[in-house]
From Swiss-Prot:
This is Insulin-like growth factor 1.L. GO terms for biological process: cell population proliferation; head morphogenesis; insulin-like growth factor receptor signaling pathway; negative regulation of apoptotic process; negative regulation of release of cytochrome c from mitochondria; negative regulation of Wnt signaling pathway; positive regulation of cell population proliferation; positive regulation of phosphatidylinositol 3-kinase/protein kinase B signal transduction. Keywords: Disulfide bond, Growth factor. Disulfide bonds join C19-C28.
Length: 44
């Protein structure tokens, strides 16, 4: 009696059953360019 059966989230995809890294990555924000917050702070 799961009403959200059609809407599977990251837990359904990768915790209750295994998934590959590429599928796991789809849930994450894209990688940012190499500049870190530390280097930006040092310039001020």
């Amino acid at each position: 009696n799961n009403r959200r059966a059609h809407h599977r989230g990251i837990v359904d995809e990768c915790c209750f059953q295994s998934c590959d890294f590429r599928r796991l990555e789809m849930y994450c924000a894209p990688a940012k360019p190499a500049k870190s917050a530390r280097s930006v702070r040092a310039q001020r």
